[in-house]
């Protein structure tokens, strides 16, 4: 049979145990979730400054951007492989965009992409 202790002694030993376990525990770091949310928000504010976006809509937009990114990357990779190249260049990306996006949307995407690449190379 276990030895009996007074109520005060039991409480004290319980407190001591809690303090030890709290100090031994390390703080868990919050894992980072990569997202396009800040960029989507910046574009939204450029186009419609007075419009907001819900977290669910932001999640959908983030999924959309990830999906399009994966499709373009896969198509560009395929094009590089067909042409026996080991590097994906802006040319492969541009061709992939032309193949994936319909008509006018592809034209606008290519012109915006070209503008972004030109801006990037001139700033170097």
UniProtKB/Swiss-Prot annotation:
Superkingdom assignment: Eukaryota
Organism annotation: Anopheles gambiae (African malaria mosquito)
Membrane-spanning intervals of the chain: none
Glycan-bearing residues: 111
Cited Pfam families: Histone
Function summary: Core component of nucleosome. Nucleosomes wrap and compact DNA into chromatin, limiting DNA accessibility to the cellular machineries which require DNA as a template. Histones thereby play a central role in transcription regulation, DNA repair, DNA replication and chromosomal stability. DNA accessibility is regulated via a complex set of post-translational modifications of histones, also called histone code, and nucleosome remodeling.
Protein family according to the UniProt entry: Belongs to the histone H2B family.
Covalent link location (Glycyl lysine isopeptide (Lys-Gly) (interchain with G-Cter in ubiquitin)): 119
Protein name per UniProt: Histone H2B
A molecular-function term among this protein's GO annotations: protein heterodimerization activity
GO CC annotations, alphabetized: nucleosome; nucleus
Lineage: Eukaryota, Metazoa, Ecdysozoa, Arthropoda, Hexapoda
Region of interest called Disordered, as start-end residue ranges on this chain: 1-32
Keywords assigned by UniProt, alphabetized: Chromosome, DNA-binding, Glycoprotein, Isopeptide bond, Nucleosome core, Nucleus, Ubl conjugation
UniProt PTM: Monoubiquitination of Lys-119 gives a specific tag for epigenetic transcriptional activation and is also prerequisite for histone H3 'Lys-4' and 'Lys-79' methylation.
Subunit: The nucleosome is a histone octamer containing two molecules each of H2A, H2B, H3 and H4 assembled in one H3-H4 heterotetramer and two H2A-H2B heterodimers. The octamer wraps approximately 147 bp of DNA.
PANTHER family reported for this sequence: HISTONE H2B
Compartment(s) of residence: Nucleus; Chromosome
């Amino acid at each position: 049979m276990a030895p009996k202790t007074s109520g005060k002694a039991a409480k004290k030993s319980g407190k001591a145990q809690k303090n030890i376990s709290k100090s031994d525990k390390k703080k868990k770091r919050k894992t980072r979730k990569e997202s396009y949310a800040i960029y989507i928000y910046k574009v939204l504010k450029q186009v419609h400054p007075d419009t907001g976006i819900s977290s669910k809509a932001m999640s959908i937009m983030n999924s959309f951007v990830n999906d399009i990114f994966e499709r373009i990357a896969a198509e560009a990779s395929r094009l590089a492989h067909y042409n026996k190249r080991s590097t994906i260049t802006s040319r492969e990306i541009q061709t992939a965009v032309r193949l994936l996006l319909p008509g006018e949307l592809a034209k606008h995407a290519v012109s915006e992409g070209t503008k972004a690449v030109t801006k990037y190379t001139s700033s170097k």
